[in-house]
């Protein structure tokens, strides 16, 4: 039996997750949305949230904006404690590793994120903390790209 996943306690996020699941991963056409499942750092339970993402090569980038609040979101604290996550983009769900973006990449990735969703700059302007950026690398993405292209059907 699959382990139970608890959706975000924020009603608007839980509603967004529900729409994401119901539409097969396309709740807001024209917007890059993904579902991120982390393991609760205290509870050990699986926790799921919906986030806007940008792509950087074969990686996804998300902002731990918490809508400009002065504290990091719980999902960010969870992945710092345990970087093994599940990411769902569209109908495809797969294991991944998630980690805070290194300082050397931050400026470039921040520009990518505010191009994707300009309101992130407004969020940054309303808080005293630096909004963390998170890189999500699907498991096997690098090996698949280097070794051979994905194909459909039998090998």
Where are these regions (language model features)?
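Extreme N-terminal tail/first-helix region
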Residues: 1-32, 142, 146-149, 155
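Short, solvent-exposed coil/turn segments
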Residues: 29-31, 46, 80, 129
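A generic local structural motif
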Residues: 21-23, 48-49, 121
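Short beta-strand segments
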Residues: 31-67
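Short, structured beta-strand-loop surface elements
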Residues: 66-120, 126-132, 138-140
């Amino acid at each position: 039996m699959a382990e139970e996943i608890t959706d975000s306690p924020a009603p608007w996020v839980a509603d967004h997750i529900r729409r994401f699941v119901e539409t097969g991963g396309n709740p807001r056409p024209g917007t890059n949305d993904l579902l991120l499942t982390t393991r609760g750092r205290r509870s050990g339970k699986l926790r799921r949230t919906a986030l806007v993402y940008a792509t950087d090569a074969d990686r996804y980038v998300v902002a731990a904006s918490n809508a400009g609040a002065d504290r990091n979101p719980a999902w960010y604290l969870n992945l710092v404690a345990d970087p093994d996550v599940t990411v769902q983009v569209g109908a495809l769900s797969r294991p991944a590793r998630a980690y805070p973006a290194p300082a050397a990449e931050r400026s470039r990735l921040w520009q990518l994120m505010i191009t994707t969703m300009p309101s992130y700059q407004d969020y940054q302007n309303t808080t005293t903390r630096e909004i963390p950026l998170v890189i999500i690398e699907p498991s096997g993405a690098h090996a698949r790209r280097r070794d051979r292209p994905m194909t459909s059907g039998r090998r």
